[in-house]
């Protein structure tokens, strides 16, 4: 889920609704959507980081040891950042791809934000173009205990298969085994992805990519976990210890 504006009205995702801020997303999930977990993908913006710090001070939300922010003892919020990387295509030209980067704690995403400000011209805005590749980005994500998931991988212009490469493994090379899952996006489904041999041992997730409150949970995942936390959700995405993705909707 994207953030349109900070609590004090600063723009984050220009194309997203102004009502789409951190607190409103949490409330929408709790009051209307009936979901247990939401990933908010613009949390590396310093404006959003400030909103999260203030949100935690309200007493309605708290961080947990296994990662994530629990809101009203029910909703687990996973902090994330969507980063646009610059890739070299097979023909030598350059393409751009989006990457979902998820982190267990506010401290981790603050560290990630500080480091990425060296590679992104305006870190306050959503999904800005960086001067690094996915191959380089995954090391920075792991430095701050995060997980990288290639975003909407078939979408034209801003994805790996849509704009950068015929093989994802060509981009990540020896680090390809660190990619546990890919996001399908609105332009594809599991039947299409299953036709690509290099994705045979990767798991698929579907997210709403919501740009407004009503669009939250337009697409979603059903997971089998022991409890709700960043650690458990990542186990499900990796299919570890009996945790797993049950379905994409």
Name these PLM-found stretches.
Residues 1-5, 43, 206-211:
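Histidine-centered catalytic micro-motifs
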Residues 182-191:
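Acidic/histidine-rich catalytic cores of soluble enzymes
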Residues 7, 47-180:
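Extended substrate/RNA-proximal surfaces in nucleic-acid metabolism proteins
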Residues 89, 110-112, 214-218, 232-238:
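Short, charged, surface-exposed secondary-structure boundary motifs
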Residues 2-19:
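Acidic/histidine-rich helix-loop elements
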Residues 202-218:
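Short acidic/histidine-rich active-site segments
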Residues 26-48, 147-149:
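Divalent metal-dependent hydrolysis catalytic cores, especially in the metallo-beta-lactamase
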Residues 225-249:
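Flexible inter-domain linker/hinge segments
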């Amino acid at each position: 889920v994207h953030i349109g504006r900070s609590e004090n009205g600063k723009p984050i995702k220009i194309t997203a609704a102004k009502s789409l801020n951190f607190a409103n997303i949490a409330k929408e999930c709790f009051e209307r959507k009936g979901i247990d977990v939401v990933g908010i993908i613009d949390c590396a913006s310093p404006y959003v980081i400030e909103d999260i710090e203030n949100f935690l001070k309200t007493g309605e939300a708290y961080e947990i040891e296994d990662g994530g922010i629990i809101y009203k003892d029910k909703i687990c919020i996973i902090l994330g950042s969507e980063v646009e990387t610059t890739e070299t295509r097979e023909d030598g030209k350059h393409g751009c791809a989006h990457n979902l980067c998820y982190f267990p704690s506010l401290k981790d995403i603050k560290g990630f934000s500080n480091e990425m400000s060296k590679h992104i011209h305006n870190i306050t805005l959503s999904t800005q173009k960086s001067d690094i590749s996915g191959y380089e980005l995954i090391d920075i994500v792991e430095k701050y205990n995060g997980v990288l998931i290639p975003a909407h991988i078939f979408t034209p212009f801003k994805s790996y298969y849509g704009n950068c490469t015929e093989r994802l493994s060509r981009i990540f090379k020896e680090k390809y085994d660190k990619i546990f899952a890919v996001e399908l996006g609105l332009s594809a489904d599991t039947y299409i992805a299953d036709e690509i041999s290099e994705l045979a041992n990767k798991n698929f997730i579907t997210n709403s990519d919501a740009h407004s409150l009503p669009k939250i949970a337009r697409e979603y995942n059903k997971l089998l976990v022991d409890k709700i936390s960043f650690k458990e959700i990542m186990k499900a995405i990796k299919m570890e210890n009996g945790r797993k993705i049950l379905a994409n909707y």
